[in-house]
Amino acid sequence: MSSDLAAPDLAAAADVIDLAGGVVGKGVRHLAANGGPDVHQLLAYDLAHAAAQVETARALLDYGAKGAQEAAIACAFTADMVHDLITRIAGREASWGIEIAPLKAAHPFLQQFRSPEFVASLAQQAGPRHLDGEMEMVIDGVAGRYG
């Protein structure tokens, strides 16, 4: 990674994930209190996707703790997750039962870890998989057959 790029910041990523999780939690409570998924199917769909993305980002924090490259991947995914959540809620805040721009505190993180330069830096080397030898053989076999 170039020295002028932002250094991965897992503590900031965790804060952004918690912020996003809080927004999703408010949306879930609002959905439950207002007729549920049968009445608000689009909201339920958006919440399901958002919750999955938030929890995937949370799981990536452990991966990110394994090294600098892994941390960069975790930060980029977290930035992409929160960007997607912002686009899901923009203009639909009332449907979610939330205030306007509830993720504005995440914008500095987005600027750092969603920048084209930062994202492009991830393509220079594949992230380590951290698999045991047996699973690496499975991957090699599948790649040899289909890759």
Where are the predicted features?
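Flavin-dependent oxidoreductase catalytic core characteristic
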Residues: M1-G147
